[in-house]
C-alpha cells in the first residue's frame, strides 16, 4: 500500500516509528507536512499539491496533526477523505476531540464518567461557577491548551476567582473542573485502537506537581486496567469517532473519569512503558481497514 503520514515532524519518535513499522511490512510511506500542502477543490477531480507538484494517489493517510495547526491540518485531511483515501482518524473526529468543551458535552450525553465541569462567560457568574464544581481546590483549563500548558490548580476560592477573572479579562476560553484529590497526581493513559485498549500506562506527576503529562516531567509505568476502565476508554474514543485515541483517565472515588481524549497520542511513552509494538499494531489496523469501501466524510 501507499501510506501518507501527515506530520510536521519527520524526526519525531512517533512519526519515525510509524514509518519504520510500515516499511517493515512492505508498504511505501511518505511523510507530508500538511502546512506545505495546497488544494484544488472542484467538481471533476480534486487534488492536493506541494511545491507545484500534484501528490500521487494514496491508499491510506495517518494524521499526526499538532493542536496548533488543527484547522489547516484538518482541511488537508478532509481533502484526502474527499478523494476517497482511507483516514485512520477522520477530520470530524479530530475536530471533535480538539474542542475540549464539545468533547465533554458529547461524553456527558453518553453517560461517560467525567469530572464536574463548568463553563461561563460573565465575571458575575464566577462565584456560582466555583460552587458548581464543589469549591476550591479546583482546576482551571484553557480550552486551547495542550501537554499540561494552560492548566492551573487553584487551591483557594480567592485564588480561583482571581485566575478566572484574569483569563476572562484576556478573553480566553476556559473551563473549570473539580479537583480529583484522590488521584494523587496520577492519571492513566489508555491507548485505544479500534474497539480495544491495546496498551495502558500510569503517569505520575513530579513531587509538588499535579499535572502528570510526560512533557511536564511525569514518569510512566505499567498499569493493570479494570474492566470498567477499559470500557470507559473505548466508549470515549467511539464518542469522538476516533479509531486511534489516547484516553486519559483519573481514578476517582466514584469510578474512572475521563479528562481528555487525544486524537494524536504519542508513541514514545506508551511503547517505552509497556514494551509493546504500538506502531506495528496501528499499521496492521490500517491494512485491515484501508481496502474496505469508505464513503467521503461529511463536511
UniProtKB/Swiss-Prot annotation:
**EC number(s) on file:** 6.3.2.-
Q: Name one Pfam family in it.
A: Rimk_N
What is the top-level taxon of the source organism?
Bacteria
Q: Tell me one GO molecular function of this protein.
A: ribosomal S6-glutamic acid ligase activity
Which key words tag this protein in UniProt?
ATP-binding, Ligase, Magnesium, Manganese, Metal-binding, Nucleotide-binding, Protein biosynthesis
Binding positions for ATP per the UniProt entry: 141, 178-179, 187, 211-213
Keyword Transmembrane among record annotations: no
Q: What residues does the ATP-grasp domain cover? A: 104-287
Q: What is one process in the GO biological process aspect for this record?
A: SOS response
Q: Does this entry carry the keyword DNA repair?
A: no
Please list the residues that bind Mg(2+) 1: 248, 260
Q: Where does Mn(2+) 1 bind?
A: 248, 260
Where do the annotations place Mn(2+) 2 binding?
260, 262
Needs which cofactor? Mg(2+); Mn(2+)
GO cellular component terms listed in the entry, alphabetical order: cytoplasm
Q: How is the cofactor bound?
A: Binds 2 magnesium or manganese ions per subunit.
Q: Where are the transmembrane segments?
A: none
Q: Which positions does UniProt annotate for Mg(2+) 2 binding? A: 260, 262
- SUPFAM superfamilies the record matches: Glutathione synthetase ATP-binding domain-like
Tell me the InterPro entries matching this sequence.
Answer: ATP-grasp, ATP-grasp_RimK-type, ATP_grasp_subdomain_1, RimK, Rimk_N, Rp_bS6_RimK/Lys_biosynth_LsyX
Under the heading NCBIfam families, the entry gives:
PRK10446.1 (NF007764), rimK_fam (TIGR00768)
- Family statement: Belongs to the RimK family.
Listed name of the protein? Probable alpha-L-glutamate ligase 2
Encoded by which gene?
Answer: rimK2
Amino acid at each position: 500500500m501507499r501510506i501518507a503520514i501527515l506530520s510536521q515532524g519527520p524526526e519525531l519518535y512517533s512519526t519515525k516509528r510509524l514509518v519504520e513499522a510500515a516499511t517493515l511490512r512492505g508498504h511505501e510511506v511518505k511523510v507530508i507536512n500538511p502546512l506545505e500542502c495546497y488544494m484544488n477543490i472542484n467538481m471533476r477531480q480534486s487534488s492536493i499539491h506541494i511545491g507545484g507538484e500534484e501528490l500521487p494517489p494514496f491508499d491510506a493517510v495517518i494524521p499526526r496533526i499538532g493542536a496548533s495547526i488543527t484547522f489547516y491540518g484538518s482541511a488537508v485531511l478532509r481533502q484526502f477523505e474527499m478523494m476517497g483515501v482511507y483516514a485512520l482518524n477522520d477530520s470530524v473526529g479530530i475536530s471533535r476531540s480538539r474542542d475540549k468543551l464539545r468533547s465533554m458535552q458529547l461524553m456527558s450525553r453518553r453517560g461517560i464518567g467525567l469530572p464536574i465541569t463548568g463553563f461561563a462567560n460573565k465575571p458575575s457568574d464566577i462565584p456560582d461557577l466555583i460552587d458548581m464544581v464543589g469549591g476550591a481546590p479546583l482546576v482551571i483549563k484553557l480550552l486551547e491548551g495542550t501537554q499540561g500548558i494552560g492548566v492551573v490548580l487553584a487551591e483557594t476560592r480567592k485564588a480561583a476567582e482571581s485566575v478566572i477573572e484574569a483569563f476572562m479579562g484576556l478573553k480566553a476560553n476556559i473551563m473549570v473542573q473539580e479537583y480529583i484529590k484522590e488521584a494523587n497526581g496520577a492519571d492513566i493513559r489508555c491507548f485505544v485502537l479500534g474497539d480495544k485498549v491495546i496498551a495502558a500506562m500510569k503517569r505520575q506527576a513530579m513531587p509538588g506537581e499535579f499535572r502528570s503529562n510526560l512533557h511536564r516531567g511525569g514518569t510512566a509505568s505499567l498499569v493493570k486496567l479494570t474492566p470498567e476502565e477499559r470500557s470507559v476508554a473505548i466508549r470515549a474514543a467511539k464518542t469522538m469517532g476516533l479509531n486511534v485515541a489516547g484516553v486519559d483517565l483519573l481514578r476517582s472515588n466514584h469510578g474512572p473519569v475521563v479528562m481528555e481524549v487525544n486524537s494524536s497520542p504519542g508513541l514514545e511513552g506508551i511503547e517505552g512503558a509497556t514494551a509493546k509494538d504500538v506502531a506495528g499494531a496501528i499499521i496492521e489496523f490500517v491494512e485491515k481497514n484501508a481496502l474496505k469501501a469508505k464513503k467521503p466524510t461529511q463536511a
